[in-house]
Amino acid sequence: MAVAHYFGQSSPLLGFDLIYEPSDKLNHNQASLNRVYDKTIRTIHAIDPQRMIFIAPKLHAAPEDLPNLKLPPQSQNTVLAQWHIFPWGPLKNNGKYPWTSGTAAEKAAIRARINTAIHWQQKTGHVSWVGGWSPGETIRNAPSASQMAFARFMACELKKAKIPYAINADTQFYDGEEGAWRPALEPLLNTMIAPECEKPGEKPGHHTLKPPVPDATRVTPAEASKQKSISP
């Protein structure tokens, strides 16, 4: 609780992520996990009643396990449930990849997991977010067409569901040692943050063209980094 005492009631935009993914004993003992969350939440909120707290279900933060979380009453505005989907991209599972070319079955499987979280939100009144997702475990070169399609679909589905999300991991897009964005991955990052999504009734692949934006008002991550690096 040292961190909670250190910040007290300052830095209101700061939230505490208690356990990114429950593992070991807590991953197999729901009662113990709920007790840990309950005690920690009460202690933190005794210091700052408005502090935002993130908690994750077991089974590696699976959305299917959200109903087993026991959340304190009247905590809808301060406790956010965190769940994960493809935190390291669509890796092979049981000999199969969950995403290849974006088939109807592959898209339906992803929508089903998102809908699981939506139904939990509607039933409990709590809000959830995706604590991390990625189009690939390690991306250093220009993304493939499959990765771009996956990123666009995931981002659009989560935005349509009004579920906020974090991107895993920032080091794939930003080189901390060099202090610069990785230009080859800029299209992928832009797609994950602000995807061009199809609207209802719109034919697949056809998007409304946006008017050109003056160069002075649009600065890409790579350009922003470059400008900072050359300023005195």
Show where each model-derived region lies.
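Active-site region of glycoside hydrolase catalytic domains
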Residues: 1-98, 104, 115-136, 160-166
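Arginine residue identity/basic-tract feature
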Residues: 35, 39-42, 51, 111-113, ...
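Alpha-helix boundary/interfacial micro-motifs
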Residues: 69, 73-75, 101, 149, ...
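Surface-exposed substrate-engagement region within the catalytic domains
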Residues: 109, 113-125, 136-159
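Aromatic-rich peripheral "rim/lid" segments of glycoside hydrolase catalytic domains that contact
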Residues: 140-232
